[in-house]
Every structure is written in structure tokens, then in C-alpha cells.
């Protein structure tokens, strides 16, 4: 492949600066969601809106993340990953500052949607470039370690957001997000390699439709992409719904709400760290299967505990922590195998994968909101368990071929 970066033993500072700056941008977009969620109670109060707008803010953000994925991946294949990625960072900076002008909750939510478009660039462009730039074992290790940095957002976001809202206006958060993205822009401008292989080809809607049709006809790819969406949805639903579950439902303080995020996202990071240690010694297939056990056990514990006692929020936290550890162990390898399940250019494949996931997240978070409003913690966690069962069923299809992910080279 052109512009292939050196393997792990020979990675220099310039090569490492690219993933580091990409993850800083990813961090800024993630904390743009996780830090504002505890502040959403203050936002809806300022705009005199109902608490049902709290998770809707995240729904709008993720809907934006689905909006342009279909175009950005193929576009970056043809005009280059670098210019598209850099444009995405600038877009995020501008929309973060524009939200300071919102006059009501509807305008705020619209701007959250526009901010969410920035998520499209991470998967469809940035991570496609990462996958194209590094060999498989190195790539999985880098992806897992990058995920740890990105996961500081949901770990620190609720704590910092809850503390911030007591001393500073919520608007200041968006200035912080824009500043972090600006730093990543200068790093990416300096260090991001150009890995696109179809530069100069004409982009037509007919060809685009043909490419996506070929990708979506690949049953193994679709199974993997849907599985990634379903297995991650309980975590996203928790991020969206937990301010209401913990602060409104359980009558705990915003500080206690922040503390309850620590075991869940700490377990997620622990799973990623274990993955990084095991990658060179175990096959991707075995790591996915290994992660499946805590995923299913954790979701079952959370569902059983809250069905028996709706206010068993500590058991729910424990179950979701076990589940999160499994995700940390399994997801990076599943992303890799899904992306390479299709021979189509990785910009298109990554975009298709991202769209399927964002569709599941956008619809799923709204369903989880209504599940909690109508059935409390029990129905919320039963919905999460259903997603785990769907993931398990899709994994049976995805890993049906015994050779899938069964070698260290891929």
C-alpha cells in the first residue's frame, strides 16, 4: 500500500503524532457529548424545557454522526483523507462556537445535530486512515490504546461536567471543546499521512450507490456492523439516560452521579489494556469470544437485579461494569474483522459500518428513553439485555467460518 507506515518497532514520532492528534479530536467530540450530559439538566432549565430533552440532545448528536457518513468515506477515497479530515475538525470548531447563540431548546438541539456531523469524520475518514497505515497486530494495539485515551471522555466527562455546572456556565464547555479540536487540527495538518488509493477518480451517485450495494450484499460485513451497534448500544444508552436515572430517578447528587460512571468506564479501559497485552499472543477470534462472556453476564446481572428491585442501581452499575470490560476486550478486534470482511475501499466500508451503527444508536437511545419512562430501571436493562442477545446471535453468523480471525496475521 502507498504511504504505508513502518511497523510497530520502527514507528517514529511523526508516525505516532497522527494517531495521537486523531484521538485528541476524537476526545474533543466525545467529551462534547459526555461532559454536557450532566449539564443538560441546567440547559433544559434555562430554556424552560422538559427533562425528556436530556437524552434527545444525545440522540440529535448521534443522528448528526450518521448524516454524512455515506458521502465522506467515498469522498475521502477520491480527493484524499487529509483534506476531508481537516475540514471536519474545522466544522466541529465552528459549530461548537455557534451553539453559544442558541435562543431556545430547539435551536440548541439543531446545533447539537450539526455538531454531531463531526463524528462522521472519525470513522469514515480518520480510522480508515489508521487501518490503512498500520499492520494488523500493530493496528489493533494502537486502536485499543487510542480507545483508552478516548474513553477518558466518558470517565472524566460526567465528573468534570457535574463540577463545572456548579461554578461555570454550561456555554463555557463548548469553548473548551473548540479549543481542544483546534489543537488537534494543527497536529493533523502536520502529521496525517495520505492513504487514499482512488484519488482522482470521479465521484458519481450511481457509482456510489453501486459501491454501497456491493458492501451491503456482504452478509458477513452486515452481521459484524450490526453486532458492533447492538453491543455498544447499552453503553450509549447509559450515557444518555444516566443523568435522569441517577439524579432524577434515584435522587442522588450530581457528584454521586459522576462517581457511578467511574467503575463502568474504568472497566472499559481495563478491557482495552488487557486486549493490548493479549493481541500478540491470541487470535482476534479468541479475543472476541473471550470478551463475549463478561458482555452477556454483565447485562444479565443488571437486568435481573433491576427487575427484582427497580432501585438496585448499585447492582445495575456492577453489571454494566462487567459488560463494559467485555466490550473493551472484544470490540477493537471485531471492528478490524468487520472492516476487512469486504474488499471494497476502506472509506466506503468504514462509512457503511458507521451508518449502520449510528442508525442503531439513534433509534436505540430513543427506545431506551421510553423504556425507562414507562418501565423504570427494570425495562431499561431488559432492553439492554435484548441488545446483548442480538449481538450474540450475530456473532454466531459472523464467526461461522472457523478461519475468520483465526490467525495472528489476519
Swiss-Prot record:
Question: How does the UniProt record describe the way this protein sits in the membrane?
Answer: Multi-pass membrane protein
Q: Name one GO biological process term.
A: regulation of cellular pH
Activity regulation details: Inhibited by CCCP.
Q: Name one GO molecular function term.
A: sodium:proton antiporter activity
Q: Which residues lie on this side of the membrane: Cytoplasmic?
A: 1-14, 73-82, 131-144, 188-226, 277-287, 336-346, 400-410
UniProt keyword terms in alphabetical order: Antibiotic resistance, Cell inner membrane, Cell membrane, Membrane, Transmembrane, Transmembrane helix, Transport
Q: What other facts are recorded?
A: A negative charge at position 26 is required for efficient transport of positively charged substrates, but not for neutral compounds. This negative charge does not play an essential role in the multidrug transport mechanism. Has a sensitive conformational switch that can be triggered either by substrate binding or by attaching unrelated agents inside the pocket. Dissimilar substrates induce similar conformational changes.
- What is the protein's known function? Efflux pump driven by the proton motive force. Confers resistance to a broad spectrum of chemically unrelated drugs. Confers resistance to a diverse group of cationic or zwitterionic lipophilic compounds such as ethidium bromide, tetraphenylphosphonium, rhodamine, daunomycin, benzalkonium, rifampicin, tetracycline, puromycin, and to chemically unrelated, clinically important antibiotics such as chloramphenicol, erythromycin, and certain aminoglycosides and fluoroquinolones. Overexpression results in isopropyl-beta-D-thiogalactopyranoside (IPTG) exclusion and spectinomycin sensitivity.
Supply the name of the protein: Multidrug transporter MdfA
Organism, per UniProt? Escherichia coli (strain K12)
Q: What is the lineage of its organism?
A: Bacteria, Pseudomonadati, Pseudomonadota, Gammaproteobacteria, Enterobacterales
Amino acid at each position: 500500500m502507498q504511504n504505508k507506515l513502518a511497523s510497530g518497532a520502527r514507528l517514529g514520532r511523526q508516525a505516532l503524532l497522527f494517531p495521537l492528534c486523531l484521538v485528541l479530536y476524537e476526545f474533543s467530540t466525545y467529551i462534547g457529548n459526555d461532559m454536557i450530559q450532566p449539564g443538560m439538566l441546567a440547559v433544559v432549565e434555562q430554556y424552560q424545557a422538559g427533562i425528556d430533552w436530556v437524552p434527545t440532545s444525545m440522540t440529535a448528536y448521534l443522528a448528526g454522526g450518521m448524516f454524512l457518513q455515506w458521502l465522506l468515506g467515498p469522498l475521502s477515497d477520491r480527493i484524499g483523507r487529509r483534506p476531508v479530515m481537516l475540514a471536519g475538525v474545522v466544522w466541529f470548531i465552528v459549530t461548537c462556537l455557534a451553539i453559544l447563540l442558541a435562543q431556545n431548546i430547539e435551536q440548541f438541539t439543531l446545533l447539537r445535530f450539526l455538531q454531531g456531523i463531526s463524528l462522521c469524520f472519525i470513522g469514515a475518514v480518520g480510522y480508515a486512515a489508521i487501518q490503512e497505515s498500520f499492520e494488523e497486530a500493530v493496528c489493533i494495539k494502537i486502536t485499543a490504546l487510542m480507545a483508552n485515551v478516548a474513553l477518558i471522555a466518558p470517565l472524566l466527562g460526567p465528573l468534570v461536567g457535574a463540577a463545572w455546572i456548579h461554578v461555570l456556565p454550561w456555554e463555557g464547555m463548548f469553548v473548551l471543546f473548540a479549543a481542544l479540536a483546534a489543537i488537534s487540527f494543527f497536529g493533523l495538518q502536520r502529521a496525517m499521512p495520505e492513504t487514499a488509493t482512488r484519488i482522482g477518480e470521479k465521484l458519481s451517485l450511481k457509482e456510489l450507490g453501486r459501491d454501497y450495494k456491493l458492501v451491503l450484499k456482504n452478509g458477513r460485513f452486515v452481521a459484524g456492523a450490526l453486532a458492533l451497534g447492538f453491543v455498544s448500544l447499552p453503553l450509549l444508552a447509559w450515557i444518555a439516560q444516566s443523568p435522569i436515572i441517577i439524579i432524577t430517578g434515584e435522587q442522588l447528587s450530581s457528584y454521586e452521579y459522576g462517581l457511578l460512571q467511574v467503575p463502568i468506564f474504568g472497566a472499559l479501559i481495563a478491557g482495552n489494556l488487557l486486549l493490548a497485552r493479549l493481541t500478540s499472543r491470541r487470535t482476534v477470534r479468541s479475543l472476541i469470544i473471550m470478551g463475549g462472556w463478561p458482555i452477556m453476564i454483565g447485562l444479565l446481572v443488571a437486568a435481573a437485579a433491576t427487575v427484582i428491585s427497580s432501585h438496585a442501581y448499585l447492582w445495575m452499575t456492577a453489571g454494566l461494569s462487567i459488560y463494559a470490560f467485555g466490550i473493551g476486550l472484544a470490540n477493537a478486534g471485531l471492528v478490524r474483522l468487520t472492516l476487512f470482511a469486504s474488499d471494497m475501499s476502506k472509506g466506503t466500508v468504514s462509512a457503511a459500518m458507521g451508518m449502520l451503527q449510528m442508525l442503531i444508536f439513534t433509534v436505540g437511545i430513543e427506545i431506551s428513553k421510553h423504556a425507562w419512562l414507562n418501565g423504570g430501571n427494570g425495562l431499561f436493562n431488559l432492553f439492554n439485555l435484548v441488545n446483548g442477545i442480538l449481538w450474540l446471535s450475530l456473532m454466531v453468523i459472523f464467526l461461522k467460518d472457523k478461519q475468520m480471525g483465526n490467525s495472528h496475521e489476519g
